[in-house]
């Protein structure tokens, strides 16, 4: 079922962080990973952090030139953001985010979870494609 969830990393800066995402994804059900305009994508640098289970996900990564293309086959998208208010969409808790996404996956529909660059997060033009936002307490 988690193969219907698309983890989208927008403009990631460090391959090592992509490897960490692959490891986490493998530990929680192996959702595929898409990259949008990565600053640097080198599987050799990502692999040590992905571990054996995440390596398969790294080998299957798809790279896109826009968020729109990365999520084109998804019917629901949640963006991550540390900022709330302003022109932002409805914000849900991580627990509510999981429930919302599971509703789509259980119906056999694709959903996406957007994460922004490590140093600044998603910008408004990235979030335009999100139906809702989730703020993850850090």
Specify the residue positions occupied by each region the protein language model found.
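Post-transcriptional modification and biogenesis factors for structured RNAs
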Residues: 1-138
């Amino acid at each position: 079922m988690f193969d219907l969830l698309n983890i989208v990393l927008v403009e990631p800066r460090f391959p090592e962080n992509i490897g960490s995402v692959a490891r986490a994804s493998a530990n929680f059900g192996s959702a595929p990973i898409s990259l949008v305009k990565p600053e640097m994508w080198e599987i050799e640098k990502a692999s040590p952090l992905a571990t054996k289970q995440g390596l398969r996900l790294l080998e299957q990564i798809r790279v896109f030139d826009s968020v729109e293309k990365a999520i084109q086959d998804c019917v629901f998208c949640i963006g991550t953001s540390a900022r709330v208010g302003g022109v932002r969409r409805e914000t849900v808790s991580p627990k509510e985010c999981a429930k919302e996404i599971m509703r789509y996956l259980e119906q056999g529909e694709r959903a996406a979870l957007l994460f922004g660059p490590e140093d600044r997060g998603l910008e408004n033009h990235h979030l335009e494609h999100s139906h809702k936002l989730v703020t993850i307490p850090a």
